[in-house]
Amino acid sequence: MPRPLSIACLQTRPMPSIGQAIDEAMPLAEQAIRAGAEFLFLPEYCGGLKSEGSALTPPHAPEAEHPFLAAFQDFAAQKSVWIMVGSIAVSGRDGKIINRGYILDQQGNIHSRYDKIHLFDVQISPTEVYRESARVTAGNAMSLVQTAFAQIGHTICYDLRFPGLYRDLAQAGAEILCTPAAFTKKTGEAHWHILNRARAIENGCFMISACAIGEIAGGGGSYGHSLVINPWGEIIADGGDTPGVVFATVDLDEVAEARGRIPSLSHDQDYTITTVKERGIT
């Protein structure tokens, strides 16, 4: 029988440099460890984020030389703690970057990687436009990760709007679905809680979604409200609109219970689409 897991989301502010991002996150990580957290979860672009017009321009470095990743690998090893580095900007090819997340084990090793599949190319309003693909190369593989505690599905931010990805992860065995994010304030106010609760309910999974909070250098801002949601869709922790640490306890027995009550993951049916046209239309 799995035992309850003490987790913490680090609700950090978007910082314009990697060094500032480390200085922002480390005190929160220390606070989480002092409180007994066994698994830490950081937001999207936790290694730094800024923007230029419609393009996101996070500071980046090659994976093997990335100061933020190295700092948290050392921290994981020193504290013997698992860490999800929600995502950082890793140098890619042709002048582009990769929005890549990691899970680090208790020895500080890279246990898994996930490259964000769905890139944030949207026009929220006439004046709020984002083109993540202008600088970022998309991934093409979902990430299901076996850890010492649970099977975890790692997604990132805009992925949240693509429920098929989450269903595929859940049907492949995920018990916890994670969506580190830097959700915008406007979309966050309208959709963040609803989308996270829906993904938890649809899949009978815990949702752990660490989200950055505050203004982004160059324009825009992130919503905050890091969430932990149980498999019944109930919010058990919400980080609100200030930086800090969000604590929760995750009991995987609740996954089996929710899926036993509503076993929809095993109820998929094949179907066809019948198109009915209005009379007179050819």
Question: Residues of each region from the PLM?
Answer:
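Active-site beta-loop-alpha junctions enriched in small/polar residues
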Residues: T12-R13, I88, K116-I117, C157, ...
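Active-site-proximal beta-strand elements of phosphoester/diester hydrolases
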Residues: P4-P16, A21, F41, R100, ...
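Cys-nucleophile CN-hydrolase/nitrilase-fold catalytic domain and related Cys-dependent amidase chemistry
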Residues: I18-Q107, R113-D115, T184-R199
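CN hydrolase (nitrilase-like) catalytic-core segments centered on the catalytic cysteine
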Residues: E63-M84, Q151, C157-V246
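Active-site catalytic loop in hydrolytic enzyme cores
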Residues: A64, G92-A172, K185-T187, I194, ...
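C-terminal beta-strand edge segments of enzyme domains
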Residues: R113, A212-T282
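Short beta-strand scaffold segments in enzyme catalytic cores
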Residues: V85-S87, R100-I103, S143-V145, S226-V228, ...
